[in-house]
Amino acid sequence: MSVGRRRGRILAFQALVAWDVGGAVLDDLLNFSWQNEDSIKDPNGYLFPKMMVLGTIENITEIDKVIQENLDNWVIDRLNSVDKAILRLSVYSLIYQKDTPPPIVIDEAINLAKDFGTDDSYKFVNAVLDSIKNKS
């Protein structure tokens, strides 16, 4: 059994936050051993979130450039780790994963921001991603 796409995005987001704050080893993140999901015994069950994490990290320079170009009066290095991880994951989806329509990517990002971010994170994430979508 594999994780669904929504759960996969949550796992990928959590892995990116852990990677960004610097305390997590990438190999540990990618096998999702930190998860306690008895129903996922198949290592292939994590292919979607693993692909999202690897794709985001492999393209981080371009992704961060796109984010920076769409920040008004902000510098990406000053963003909190939660908002940064949501934006990075979403920009990866917008640029490199053409199988998910942009409105769905943005909606998923807003949901992550509402669940894990500050009170205003979802507005900020929505504005940045909307700007990126409109320029592409």
From Swiss-Prot:
In the record, what terms sit under GO molecular function?
A: RNA binding
Which InterPro entries does the entry mention? NusB-like_sf, NusB_fam, NusB_RsmB_TIM44
SUPFAM superfamilies on file: NusB-like
Give an example GO cellular component term for this record: cytosol
Per the UniProt record, one Pfam family is NusB
> Which UniProt keywords are listed?
RNA-binding, Transcription, Transcription antitermination, Transcription regulation
The record's Gene Ontology biological-process terms are: DNA-templated transcription termination; transcription antitermination
Output the superkingdom of the source species.
Answer: Bacteria
Biological role stated in the UniProt entry: Involved in transcription antitermination. Required for transcription of ribosomal RNA (rRNA) genes. Binds specifically to the boxA antiterminator sequence of the ribosomal RNA (rrn) operons.
Q: Which family does it belong to?
A: Belongs to the NusB family.
Cross-referenced HAMAP family: NusB
Q: This chain belongs to which protein, by name?
A: Transcription antitermination protein NusB
